[in-house]
Amino acid sequence: MSRHLLSLRSVSICVAAALLPFATQAIEPSQAVKVTQLLKATQTWNGVPIKYPEGQAEVTGLMIEIALGGETHWHEHPVPSFGVLLEGTLEVSLTDGRKKLLKPGEALAEVIATAHNGRNVGTTPLKLIVFYAGAVDKQPLSVPRPESKPKTN
């Protein structure tokens, strides 16, 4: 074997040996990762199909915090939105009287173009992460609908 070939083989073995720890480190973190599906939906929680707006996609993520006894007030979202409750207890009401109760760790596909009100009905402040799937310069994320409040007799 030529001296050049022996030197090349030695260098290759040394490089492979040096990179071996990095290869095992790349595998280890994936073995320590746990994936839990929070939501998989084709419809909002009130049964309406989810449709994305046209145009350049723009995703917005918000942390929404509601104090004890607080509420969002009546509003609607013209774009699809998806939330995960981190803390507190959330009650979402529709004008037709339907309600959805969320506890920490639960997720939902919010209603689209439907007036609703979210209230913190728990005993601790509420924290909710919501992602909105909108389009650049198209619709707002939320539109107030104070006239949608259900009438009480």
For the regions a protein language model found, what residue spans apply to each?
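A short beta-loop-beta micro-motif enriched in histidine and acidic residues
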Residues: 53-58, 69-84
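Soluble periplasmic/extracytoplasmic beta-strand elements of cell-envelope proteins
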Residues: 65, 91, 129-132
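Short acidic-glycine-tyrosine-enriched beta hairpin
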Residues: 66, 96-113
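Histidine-centered metal-chelating micro-motifs
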Residues: 71-73, 108, 112-119
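Glycine- and acidic-residue-biased ligand/ion/polar-headgroup-sensing regions
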Residues: 77-96, 106
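Ligand-binding loop in jelly-roll beta-barrel domains
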Residues: 113-138
